[in-house]
């Protein structure tokens, strides 16, 4: 973990696991690694950025237990665990920087590849992790924030319990099989810290 000033506030950066198991890795790190465990009392928030895959629908209860454990790392107030999710692939969130779109499905490898190719049509040098391409895309973030909010709001008609970041809403999103993103909530939160 590195702790550094990022222009907003102090930020702790956890290593992204190279395989699936983000939630269990975080729990394990806070249980066993002194560099995380020793900072638990001063940890305000833990953010999980992840893609919701089709096979994640049945994993909510397991993840919920880990979320509850992580919240309890600090008492009064508990650690806030924020789930920042995008259906199936980050390229969907990135496409929202350029146009409003709600694909009916983003569940197959082919769906994800189509989304990636659509992004490459707009940003020809895009590759996952390419800093130059990401910076170009990020310049359009206000549009993505607005569009991501519209995508989420459209799910109210499909049964989304609330737009508020609640456990009930997050459970529904992880199990709904619909196209969505909540990444815009991180940006809205960070921008609120500036004011």
Predicted regions and their residues:
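C-terminal accessory helical subdomains adjacent to catalytic cores in phosphodiester-
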Residues: 2-14, 27-47, 52-195
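Short, charge-patterned binding micro-sites
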Residues: 16-22
């Amino acid at each position: 973990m590195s702790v550094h000033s990022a222009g907003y506030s102090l930020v702790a950066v956890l290593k992204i696991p190279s395989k699936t198991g983000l939630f269990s890795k975080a729990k394990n790190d806070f249980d066993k690694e002194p560099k995380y465990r020793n900072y638990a009392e001063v940890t305000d928030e833990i953010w999980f950025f992840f893609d919701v895959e089709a096979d994640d629908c049945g994993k909510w209860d397991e993840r919920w237990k880990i979320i509850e454990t992580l919240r309890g790392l600090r008492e009064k107030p508990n650690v806030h665990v924020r789930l920042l999710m995008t259906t199936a692939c980050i390229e969907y969130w990135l496409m929202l920087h350029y146009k409003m779109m709600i694909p009916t499905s983003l569940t197959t490898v082919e769906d994800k590849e189509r989304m990636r190719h659509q992004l490459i049509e707009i940003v020809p040098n895009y590759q996952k992790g390419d800093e130059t391409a990401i910076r170009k895309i990020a310049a359009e973030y206000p549009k993505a924030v607005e569009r991501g909010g519209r995508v989420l709001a459209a799910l109210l008609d499909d049964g989304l319990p609330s737009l508020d970041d609640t456990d009930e809403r997050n459970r529904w999103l992880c199990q709904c099989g619909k196209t969505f993103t909540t990444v815009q909530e991180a940006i809205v939160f960070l921008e609120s810290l500036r004011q």
